């Protein structure tokens, strides 16, 4: 074999080795998605989205008669959306302001403290965040509530938003800020009216990724929101969520089919959010 042929052989061997090991990581993911879709699509209908979780008796009677389990996860969907919305109201402004500070004051002593705390929170198990929210909100209020659940989710969203904001602002050319200051604008005006709008695509992507990250959390909500069998709009009362319903269905053999349909809904919701985030990031980079 000539030297050129040997190098070509090595290149092809390396290429196909990379493809093989990449497929090893992708195959389990596709198998999981296929399993969830195959077992979950049967329960997906209009009632699944507008009715609350079924009782054990109704599920048992339906299974014995060979019918679809009645009811749905409307209480979980409304609870998830409500708590994520409240968590976003808390985490988005705080996270953006924190990211702006880290990007604009990289050498400040307080910046190192914020970075350390951000990394610490991001690496903490979700159950620990739930315990913190329990001691901060549940115990003082005397009951589990949607506010407590949203507090736990907001804490988990903060590191992602702070980091994405910081990295996005660092990618902006320094001439933007210099031009604004040269025109006589105050530093605050430059940040609010120039830097943040210019970084909107990156900020929006980070926010969507943070939301998709917390939508599937169960452990912190078990210690804060607890769950509810009905649709509850009172933020001071226990509230359900889709991950909590999946856990409840798991503990009832008669509701096993609802696990797959609920998982499919949650999987598709998070997948859509991630696709939107990727598209926004792609358009922002090419703009």
Segments and roles (model prediction):
Residues 119-155:
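Generic hydrophobic transmembrane alpha-helix motif, especially the helices
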Residues 86-118, 278-286:
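Transmembrane-helix boundary motif in ABC transporter permease subunits
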Residues 60, 221-267:
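Interhelical loop and adjacent transmembrane-helix boundary motif
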Residues 187-223:
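Transmembrane alpha-helices
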Residues 1-24, 277-287:
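Transmembrane alpha-helical segments of polytopic membrane transport and secretion proteins
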Residues 166-170, 208, 248-287:
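C-terminal transmembrane helix and the adjacent membrane-cytosol boundary/short C-terminal tail
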Residues 2-12, 16, 35-87, 107, ...:
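Periplasmic/extracellular loop-to-transmembrane helix junction in inner-membrane transport proteins
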Residues 125, 183-184, 197:
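Glycine/proline-centered hinge or cleavage motifs at structural transition points of membrane proteins
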């Amino acid at each position: 074999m000539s030297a050129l042929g040997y190098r070509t052989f090595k290149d092809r061997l390396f290429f196909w080795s990379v493809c093989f090991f990449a497929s090893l990581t992708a195959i389990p993911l596709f198998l999981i998605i296929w399993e969830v879709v195959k077992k979950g699509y049967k329960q997906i209908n209009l009632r699944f989205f507008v009715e609350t979780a079924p009782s054990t008796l109704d599920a048992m009677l339906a299974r014995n008669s060979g019918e679809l389990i009645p009811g749905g996860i409307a209480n979980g969907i409304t609870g998830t959306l409500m708590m994520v919305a409240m968590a976003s109201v808390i985490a988005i402004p705080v996270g953006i302001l924190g990211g702006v500070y880290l990007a604009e004051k990289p050498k400040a002593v307080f910046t190192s403290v914020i970075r350390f705390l951000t990394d610490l929170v991001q690496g903490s198990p979700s159950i620990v965040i739930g315990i913190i929210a329990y001691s901060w909100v549940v115990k003082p209020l005397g009951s589990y509530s949607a506010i407590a659940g949203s507090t736990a989710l907001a804490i988990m969203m903060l590191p992602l938003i702070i980091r994405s904001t910081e990295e996005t602002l660092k990618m902006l050319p320094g001439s933007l800020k210099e031009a604004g200051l040269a025109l006589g604008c105050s530093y605050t005006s430059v940040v609010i009216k120039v830097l943040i709008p210019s970084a909107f695509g990156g900020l929006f992507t980070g926010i969507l990724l943070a939301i998709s990250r917390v939508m599937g959390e169960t452990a912190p909500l078990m210690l804060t929101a607890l769950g509810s069998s009905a649709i509850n709009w009172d933020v001071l009362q226990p509230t359900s969520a889709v991950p909590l319903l999946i856990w409840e269905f798991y503990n009832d053999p008669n509701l096993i089919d609802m696990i797959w349909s609920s998982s499919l809904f949650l999987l598709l919701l998070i997948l859509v959010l991630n696709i939107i985030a990727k598209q926004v990031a792609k358009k922002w980079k090419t703009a």
